[in-house]
A protein has these predicted regions:
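Glycine/threonine-rich beta-strand-loop-alpha-helix active-site module
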Residues: 140-151
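Contiguous, glycine/small-aliphatic-enriched amphipathic segments in soluble metabolic enzymes
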Residues: 4-138
């Protein structure tokens, strides 16, 4: 048995919420934008709806708008404050292709980059690269390799 004379009783319990409170306050004061590359996955929709409800981050979902909204409705998730971007209809798509070709330094053609950017993992990565978002979360349906390969 250990001697008790050197022990202090801690009466305060620190919760995870307490630990993250300063970070949450900082994010609310200066919200960052996160891109979710799998915009119709129920796990992603749940996370996005929670972040939006808490006002912690601005949310961009990549995917077909109708499919994302239908999946959210089916799961009971409110993503009405999220921006949904469909690579097939993105106004800055040509600029994105041009930037990717330059970044790849001739290793891929414009046609190859166009095909890659229609995949949400590549598209989301380029949104971050081009300053349209601050960070990206993927991997719900993509493998780890497919999630990091575009970087």
């Amino acid at each position: 048995m250990l001697p008790m004379n050197n022990c202090k009783v801690i009466s305060e319990v620190i919760t995870m919420a307490d630990m993250f409170a300063p970070l949450v306050a900082q994010l609310k004061a200066n919200p960052k934008t996160i891109v979710f590359t799998e915009g119709n996955d129920p796990r992603i929709l749940e996370a996005a709806s929670k972040l939006l409800a808490e006002g912690v981050l601005k949310v961009v979902m990549v995917g077909n708008e109708a499919e994302c909204k239908a999946a959210a409705a089916a799961g009971g998730f409110d993503i009405s404050a999220a921006e949904i971007i469909d690579p097939e209809n993105y106004a800055g798509f040509d600029e994105m292709v041009h930037t990717m070709v330059e970044l790849r330094k001739g290793k891929q053609t414009a046609e190859e980059c166009t095909a890659l950017l229609k995949k949400s993992n590549y598209f989301g990565t380029m949104l971050v690269k081009m300053g349209k978002a601050d960070c990206l979360l993927g991997g719900a349906t993509y493998s780890t390799a497919d999630t990091i390969r575009p970087a």
